[in-house]
């Protein structure tokens, strides 16, 4: 997916985007390509699909949550090179984002890119989530660990909810978490990303771009 296709999609989904935000989204590709020459932050293959596999995927959290993230304090756990935190920080400039990862080279990249984009609402820290002080309104993350492993890391860290990007067959994972933590199945909600992104949203893009989202979900608990 090229930027033009990405721009067409997000300007339909988020009607109040400014030119500044669009320029920030556009600049991301070259920044990650430059960093990937030094540090393999995202796979070489995924640099070709950065607008679909990374930006649009990250923004699907906003497609689900809509204005609930506006003006909030948000923790991105296991951010890696800055996903989903950096795209969400562009979309919600009035929200405060803390991006954490335990690997120093990844936080180096995320911090540099946030600074290059002029994102004053982003703080990047090298730390494990469970060691961070304080609470946040929301926790977000992208496929860092199973629910059984992830939930203890963020216990007591959020006031409202956890929003996770997941792929594949999520039902066994949800069932395992419900069993271990004695949660009712209805307390974990799953939302299919393709209920937000339809095939007609991909003008000029290959069918592969749309198909990639087929087994992608946002989970909230």
Predicted regions and their residues:
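Conserved S-adenosyl-L-methionine
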Residues: 76-80
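Conserved SAM-binding loop of SAM-dependent methyltransferases across substrates and taxa
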Residues: 81-94
């Amino acid at each position: 997916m090229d930027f033009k296709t990405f721009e067409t999609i997000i300007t339909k989904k988020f009607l109040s985007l400014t030119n500044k935000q669009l320029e920030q989204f556009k600049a991301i590709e070259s920044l990650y390509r430059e960093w990937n020459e030094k540090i393999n932050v995202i796979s070489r293959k995924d640099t070709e699909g950065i607008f679909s596999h990374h930006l649009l995927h990250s923004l699907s959290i906003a497609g689900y949550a809509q204005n609930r993230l506006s003006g909030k304090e948000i923790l991105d756990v296991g951010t890696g090179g800055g996903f989903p935190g950096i795209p969400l920080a562009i979309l919600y400039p009035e929200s405060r984002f803390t991006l954490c990862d335990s690997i120093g080279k990844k936080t180096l990249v995320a911090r540099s890119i946030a600074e290059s984009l002029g994102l004053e609402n982003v703080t990047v820290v090298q730390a494990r989530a469970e060691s961070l002080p304080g609470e946040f309104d929301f926790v977000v993350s992208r496929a860092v660990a199973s629910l059984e492993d992830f939930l203890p890391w963020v216990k007591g860290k959020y006031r409202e909810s956890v929003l996770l990007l997941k792929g594949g067959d999520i039902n066994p994972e949800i069932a395992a978490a419900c069993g271990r933590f004695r949660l009712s199945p209805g307390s974990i909600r799953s939302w299919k990303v393709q209920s937000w992104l339809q095939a007609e949203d991909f003008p000029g893009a290959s069918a592969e771009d749309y198909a990639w989202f087929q087994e992608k979900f946002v989970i909230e608990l």
